[in-house]
Amino acid sequence: MIFEEDFTKKYEDFITVRFLLASKMRPSLLLMLSDSDCNLNDFREELEKPSASILHGLKELERINLIKKNFKNYSLSTKGILCSASLEKLFQDLYIFQINRDFWQNHSIDSIPQDAFRKSYLLRDSVFVESDEHNLSKAFNKYLDLIGACGDMKIILPIFLEEHLEIILENLENGDNLLLITNEDVFSSLKSSKYYEELVDFSKKGQVSIRKADHDLKVFLTVCDDFMSLSLFYKDGLYDNSCFILNEQKDGIEWANILLDKYLENSIKML
């Protein structure tokens, strides 16, 4: 019974959103009202549309209980407040994927769980960093500069990179901490590398924790106190070190922690 009620609610929400998006006028009216109550003149000035079109849209929103009218003013109903908030998040999500379209379209995103995608609006202030023909290492060098100056590090590491590990060890020597989530191949490479004994020593001091994911990794994620970065694999399985998403805002770092926690839940401690 609870499942049926939940399904019915989600279906009704879907129908409402689909109804709103079938018109340019309806979402515009709803989002205006999310800022403040408005009258017909307010709508006319902002939208530059004739009164007849605006009134038609308002009546449609009133009919499905998203807005209410009090004399000459219109305001959101309780249902309308919730719907407008969902609509704003949807538009923010679409904007994020639009401005970085090539990044998302050209790479595999199968390793990013739905929970993270539902909150992708948190990435709205991200910067796309990309190498070019004049500097093929531009993106990776930018990443190394960033991680070299950060404090505590939480990293999902799907590939073995010596340059990367050398900088991490320098940070550890400065007293920073590392949480590393990786796969079987990278962990095996770490164990046979010249860096492993140092990592073991730092682990004994409580500075390092290395965990192994129980499935293949197709994301390279770094989370620090003041930035996050995300790079992905091509759809053919090759890692792309030529570009990454960078975010230095609180919301972007929150999104990265959501993604990292999902992998943390499905990992086992190795060191």
Where are these regions (language model features)?
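Signature of lipid phosphatidyltransferase scaffolds
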Residues: 105, 235-271
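Short, compositionally biased leader-like segments
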Residues: 28, 181-195, 258, 263-271
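HKD-type phospholipase D/PLD-like phosphodiesterase module
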Residues: 185-220
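Amphipathic coiled-coil/heptad-repeat helices and related helical stalk/stem segments
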Residues: 13, 136-140, 161-165, 195, ...
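Primarily the HKD phosphodiesterase
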Residues: 143-199
